[in-house]
Amino acid sequence: DVDHLIVAGGAGGGGRGGGGAGGMLTGTGVAVSAGTYTITVGAGGDGGESGATGTATNGANSVALSVTATGGGHGGNNATSGYDGSVGGSGGGAGWNTNTSSAGTYGAGTAGQGYAGGALDVPAGYVYGGGGGKAEAGSTDAAGYGGDGATGYGIGATTPYYAGGGGGGRSNGDS
């Protein structure tokens, strides 16, 4: 039997919203037979620049023992398209829709793998949504903060954190 911790690739941050953490799954006592197993480690997504051509990309899935952790959702941009955070293992934070001068939406997380990205906080001075993490949604601790990663999977004396979301950007104001 084996125990596993599988984390997918984290997403790129958009020109404004933070990228979501890669989805994270754990398991204990999984029965395996002697043999060779293929394990795919998902790559991280690319960050995007502000503007119409700067859309970020999602992280890639990680797969092991027939279990798939979903790549993180990219953060939203400041543009006429790509302003919404994307769905992913953990969702991407919201950006800004320059067509309508309004906030984009944040991306949802995947159940059991991570949380949603955060919303744009205009009263805080156009602080864009943080990416979701394994332990909480983006912008939970404060506007623009990435969601916390999960703890409790340490080996030895340390307690590392896994699958934390990226922080959102901030601007001087959009109109």
What is each of the regions a protein language model found here?
Residues 53-56, 99-104, 121, 138-154:
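Surface-exposed ligand/attachment interfaces on beta-rich extracellular proteins
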Residues 7-65, 142, 147, 169-175:
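Glycine-rich strand-loop-strand elements at beta-sheet edges
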Residues 44-47, 59, 85-91, 114-117, ...:
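Collagen triple-helix signature
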Residues 1-12, 151, 155-158, 162-166:
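Beta-rich globular "head" domains
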Residues 108-122:
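Predominantly extracellular/luminal regions of secreted and cell-surface proteins
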Residues 45-101:
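Acidic, low-complexity glycine/serine/threonine-rich segments
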Residues 129-130, 154:
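Polybasic, low-complexity association/targeting segments
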